[in-house]
Structures are given as C-alpha cells and as structure tokens.
A protein has these predicted regions:
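Nucleotide-activated chemistry modules centered on ATP-dependent adenylation/adenylyltransferase
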Residues: 1-214
C-alpha cells in the first residue's frame, strides 16, 4: 500500500476496528486481500454480515480454515472451546493464519492499545517474524485510537456494523467464547469467559525491534 513496499493484506474479523482500517485501505487498494479466519464457530450474524459486506464492497475475501472441520475436530478432541480454548484457537485460528500470511510482506490489523492490557505497548508499525522464518511488517493504524474515535468514524462514514454489537458485546469473536465483559474497563474480558485475553493470532509471531513512530 502507499508508502510501503511489498504485498499487503489485512486480517478482518468484521469488528468495527477492522472495518475502519479496511475502509481506509480500500481508498488506496480496493482489491487488497482480506483474510478472514473462518473458525466454524462464528455468530450466524457474523457470517451474514461478512457476506453482505463482501458483496457490497466487492472485497477480495480469502477464507482461512483449519485442516479439520468443526465436526472432525470435536470427534477427535471433544469440544475444545470448553475444555482447552487455547488449543482450539491454535487449531482454528493460529495455524490457518500462519499459513495464510506466508505470501505477504505487510499485514494490516485493527488492533488498538486500549483494547487490552496485553496490547498497551502496541506500535503502529512492527517487524514480525513468522515461525517459518518469513518476515513481515505488521501495521496497526488505529493503535492510538480509542473506542469513541472508532465509532465516530463508523457513524460519520455511514458504515454498516455487525449487529451483534447491539446485544451488548464490545468485543466479538467465536460465539461460544464471547460474553458480556466481566471488567467494564477491559472490553476483551468477555472473551473466553475471562480465562485469557488473546486467541494467539497476535502473539505467535516473534516481534523484532520496531522502526517506526509510536
């Protein structure tokens, strides 16, 4: 994308932050690859919204899936999102994303510092290395934004948002692992019943020394 060299993509869970970044990127590259982690456990509303926005915005949508279907995984290991959510995320999110990122040099995200204590030191541009040794730039344009700024952008630009937000969820992932936050000051505390704050897709890479501004 403009000012950066290499092949770029964006990971998108169709939450509002991702839609803001995608809205901005489409003004530069309307065909930027949009990587969606299709875990098989998303809300029905998420799938419907994804399909609607993919058609309306003519997205270059790439669905990343685990090697096993939900039925195959549950037959082999039981319902991991209840017994071992970290392993479930590893199989259905981390491993597919690790494969999906290999062709790219630049990875755009909708991460923000105020989303969770685990993200408080997030920089807008970071150098990351995949487990395979592939290096890439991880770019989080909204790192210094807050929730109000995100929603103001959504409203100001008339962007349709995922209807699940209207049920009171400030952070939305797989349906079995999404609930109302236990800590009102930490929107991600409603994920995985408060057992953890990250699924692993933003922690499986090795972060090198950043080169860019805060």
């Amino acid at each position: 994308v403009s000012g950066l060299e290499g092949k770029a993509c964006i990971t998108n869970s169709f939450q509002v932050e991702d839609m803001v970044v995608l809205h901005l990127l489409r003004q530069i590259d309307p065909k930027i690859p949009v990587l969606f982690l299709d875990t098989g456990y998303h809300f029905a509303e998420t799938y419907a919204y994804r399909d609607r926005m993919a058609e309306e915005w003519k997205l270059n949508l790439i669905s990343l899936q685990a090697k096993q279907s939900v039925a195959e995984q549950e037959a082999a290991f039981g319902i991991l999102n209840r017994t071992d959510p970290t392993r479930c995320c590893g199989l259905r999110k981390v491993e597919p994303l690790m494969r999906g990122l290999e062709p790219y040099d630049i990875w755009f995200t909708g991460l923000r510092r105020d989303q969770s204590p685990t993200r408080k030191n997030l920089r807008k541009v970071e150098h990351h290395t995949l487990p395979t040794g592939k290096t890439l730039l991880k770019v989080s344009p909204l790192a210094d934004w807050n929730s109000k700024q995100v929603w103001n952008y959504i409203t100001r630009n008339g962007i349709e948002y995922l209807p699940v937000y209207d049920k009171g969820y400030p952070s939305i992932g797989c349906e079995p692992c999404t609930s109302i936050p236990e800590d009102p000051n930490n929107p991600r505390s409603g994920r995985w019943s408060g057992q953890k704050l990250e699924c692993g897709i933003h922690t499986f890479t090795e972060k090198d020394s950043p080169q860019e501004s805060q």
